């Protein structure tokens, strides 16, 4: 996914940065109007622990492609991945262009006291509120990618086997450590028992009779 993001940006970056002709207001009659994309400046990227490599590198790729410099703050809950990312960044970029800050809450708090031209945060709603609060002091634009609720609805017309297969896959992917993993199921009472039976079958089919021993079942990084 990271490589595909790099390829996508390389393929489309000229189009993304091209001037676009826009309507000229009457007060500017006889002139021509354009919009021209430009970088924000210094961008802070704060990435989460559930997909620590992907969700650090993807926004970094886009920020660099847009001409920004970046401070990247990976999660303290995935320290080995953070060390690897820091090593890679040091080998590929000068610290004036991209720098990695590791650590936990103290480092996050310190960073949010600084002025940035843009902040991209992926994580929980509680921390997202704090990021928004701190950024407002500098009127810094922010993108918040936060966790939410992802219910699944199974009614009496559903293909129960297909629904069970997809829900089990979605819930157990990365041990449920995915922002859009199903939180709960709203199931019609008339198909509840049959649906639960299909769910149990799918768990066994996808992960065996002892899921915790399955090589397809990952690790819980943060309870």
PLM feature spans:
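Long amphipathic alpha-helix in the N-terminal Rossmann-like dinucleotide-binding domain
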Residues: 1-19, 30
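Acidic catalytic patch
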Residues: 17-22, 36
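Short linear capping/connector segments at secondary-structure termini
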Residues: 21-28, 103, 212-217
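Rossmann-like NAD(P) dinucleotide-binding subdomain of oxidoreductase/dehydrogenase enzymes
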Residues: 25-162, 200
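ALDH superfamily catalytic-core signature
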Residues: 93, 126-223
